């Protein structure tokens, strides 16, 4: 199954899962689509377009570069800190923040291997898409916090429904619907896992937490995701596994600790 066809099913199922989450939390279902215009616009770029860009980046990148594309995407906690300073008025200790950010960037650079300068990527489009997409996602999250959007006005279902439409139309353009393999148990399993877990439930809960919790702490904790995801990618894409991949993920995590140490935001703060 092509990447856009799979993304259509995954994000469409994720949107339906987010509706179920809204219902189980006893929140009005009408709030799913009655969103402020600015949230709809920001979510188009920060959720729908970001997800499509990341999928395209993974699809275009050679297997040896998958790990680096993944870590470039996970620079969004860095962008959250920078954008938090700009839009939220946070004033962390600048030297520690810069040190943490540089460690994260260096971690990404070496994640492809220690021969980056002698063997640069042949195609810069995948890393560019992953980097820009991660920035758009971070901007969306910070703007939600700045605008103090009510918790019940969750845009996850709406934005992923839009994403499913974009992915579906892209799959039409790429003629992926004409080459879908016969349905099988493993295919259905991965669609359901992707839709219910990382898209439907995880995004819904993350959006709720970032509206109410300390954005610097959330950004810092998010840094621990790269280690787990890098291990999984190394498991499924053995060509991308190298000493630099795990070391780079560890550097990003340590950079997160520095950024968190630099933050002057208290854990109990709410908007």
Segments and roles (model prediction):
Residues 3-23, 37-41, 96-106, 125-132, ...:
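Hydrophobic alpha-helical transmembrane segments of multi-pass integral membrane proteins
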């Amino acid at each position: 199954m092509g990447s856009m066809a799979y993304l259509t099913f995954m994000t469409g199922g994720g949107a339906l899962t987010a509706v179920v989450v809204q219902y189980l939390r006893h929140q009005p279902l009408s709030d799913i689509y009655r969103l402020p215009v600015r949230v709809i616009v920001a979510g188009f770029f920060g959720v729908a377009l970001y997800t499509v860009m990341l999928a395209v980046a993974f699809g275009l990148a050679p297997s040896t570069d998958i790990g680096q594309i993944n870590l470039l995407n996970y620079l969004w906690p860095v962008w959250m800190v920078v954008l938090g300073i700009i839009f939220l008025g946070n004033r962390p200790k600048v030297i520690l923040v810069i040190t943490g950010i540089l460690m994260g960037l260096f971690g990404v650079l070496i994640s492809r291997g220690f021969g980056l300068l002698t063997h640069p990527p042949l195609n810069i489009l995948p890393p560019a898409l992953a980097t820009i997409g991660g920035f758009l996602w971070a901007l969306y999250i910070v703007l939600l916090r700045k605008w103090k959007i009510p918790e019940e006005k969750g845009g996850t279902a709406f934005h992923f429904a839009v994403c499913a439409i974009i992915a579906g139309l892209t799959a039409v353009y790429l003629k992926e619907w004409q080459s879908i393999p016969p349905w099988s148990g493993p295919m259905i399993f991965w669609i359901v896992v992707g839709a219910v877990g990382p898209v439907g439930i995880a995004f819904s809960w993350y959006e709720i937490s970032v509206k109410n919790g300390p954005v610097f702490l959330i950004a810092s904790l998010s840094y621990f995701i790269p280690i787990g995801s890098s291990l999984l990618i190394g498991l499924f894409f053995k060509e991308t596994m190298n000493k630099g991949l795990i070391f780079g993920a560890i550097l990003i995590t340590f950079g997160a600790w520095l950024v968190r140490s630099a933050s002057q935001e208290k854990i109990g703060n709410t908007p």
